Swiss-Prot record:
Keywords, in A-Z order: Methyltransferase, RNA-binding, rRNA processing, Transferase, tRNA processing
Subunit comment: Interacts with nop5. Component of box C/D small ribonucleoprotein (sRNP) particles that contain rpl7ae, FlpA and nop5, plus a guide RNA.
Native organism taxonomy: Archaea, Thermoproteota, Thermoprotei, Thermoproteales, Thermoproteaceae
Domain of life: Archaea
Tagged with keyword Transit peptide: no
Keyword RNA-binding among record annotations: yes
Family: Belongs to the methyltransferase superfamily. Fibrillarin family.
GO biological process per UniProt: box C/D sno(s)RNA 3'-end processing; tRNA processing
EC number(s) from the headed UniProt entry: 2.1.1.-
PANTHER family on file: FIBRILLARIN (PTHR10335:SF17), RRNA 2-O-METHYLTRANSFERASE FIBRILLARIN (PTHR10335)
Record organism: Pyrobaculum neutrophilum (strain DSM 2338 / JCM 9278 / NBRC 100436 / V24Sta) (Thermoproteus neutrophilus)
Protein purpose: Involved in pre-rRNA and tRNA processing. Utilizes the methyl donor S-adenosyl-L-methionine to catalyze the site-specific 2'-hydroxyl methylation of ribose moieties in rRNA and tRNA. Site specificity is provided by a guide RNA that base pairs with the substrate. Methylation occurs at a characteristic distance from the sequence involved in base pairing with the guide RNA.
Protein name: Fibrillarin-like rRNA/tRNA 2'-O-methyltransferase
Amino acid sequence: MSIEVVEVRPHERHFGVYALKFEDGSERLATRNLTPGKRVYGERLVKWGGAEYREWNPYRSKLAAAIANGIKFVPIQEGTHILYLGAASGTTPSHMSDIVGERGLIYSVEFSPRVFREFMEKLVDQGRRNVVPILGDARFPYQYAHYVKGVDVAYIDVAQPAQAKILADNADYFLKPGGYVMLVIKAMSIDVTAPATETFKQEINTLKERGFEILETVHLEPYDTAHAMVVARKR
Ligand SMILES: C[S@@+](CC[C@H](N)C(=O)[O-])C[C@H]1O[C@@H](n2cnc3c(N)ncnc32)[C@H](O)[C@@H]1O
């Protein structure tokens, strides 16, 4: 039998993020479900105060891991337009879709046709109208330049080498002046022989060289080994 939720309250720092409190005193992150009754990855749904919330699992979503680890600033709120590179089957994009609401947009780029089909089934076919699915390769932003309008945030989680470069190339095309980038660094996919901190430094240097001011870096352990999240702003 699952334990009961005894309180749902807004997160003290992040817009559109909630804390679910359980009867045993434990707490979990959640977002308010934009498509009530529908799940994306088997997450728990909680009805509270006339709304429905989706539990946000930090072991499944690196943005949730960064929030659970105390990231201070997430540049996402109601109405934010986001370019999401490496959308996979939509776990993190679905929570962003909850947060930005009907006035926001998540341009979601994924290059694997099989995974993209899952994304379509789980998000688009389920009625998330603020998601724009793009089957494309993030290394070649010109391929989808005609679909994407200026964005407030560019987010990357492609688990491939040269992520900072790919992110900066996309920012050159699509990021509005003063916009933000969020970079998930997976040390192993960049250089398996280098220690994680070395790899993190290299990727951060690439962002600095491309004109970004680094605002924050958060490690994602214990949720993800050798991963970090970097938030930066275009100077
Ligand atoms: C770690 S998963 C992303 C998980 C997702 N961000 C989430 O939190 O829900 C990485 C995804 O990036 C995709 N990917 C890798 N290289 C890519 C590229 N160059 N362009 C687009 N997608 C890419 C992979 O197919 C995979 O689905």
